[in-house]
């Protein structure tokens, strides 16, 4: 679920036999947005790490800081807490396989938990998640599980509408610029075949949404 943003080596000279492509204004603006998002995500991560200790380890979001898709579940698992990274372990592997099956670029995805420690006050967690949503500015939020849907509803995010947890796999409107869809909790959908089927039936809507996304 991690992202890789490769930049050209500034010490590498351009070949004299090839014209150097001029960067467009749009590219430069996008680069500035990305640098700012990386800085803000890192700042949030530093704040969370400063609040942690040996017994309370924050689980930081992972993926592209300007991801089109924002994967969200309620609380971290032990494997995530051990590594300090959201969606580390079985859930992340299951989601990666699902994204690949649907043709969704994993590098366009950001994933996090509502609760960063699993033990913090809800008001703290709501403030941190609100910051993440403002930084990433996703086009689609995938809310995994009813507790996640309820938590989103408590954010009072600007111009947001309440999501219906009883409509799994349907596109809903979260804000005028952010779509949303509800799925079962991925952590509870890894073992029993019926649970796997229910998660996939809802999650595969992401593939249709992604295919219809304008390429610009």
Where do the PLM segments sit?
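A polyanion-binding, active-site-adjacent surface
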Residues: 2-216
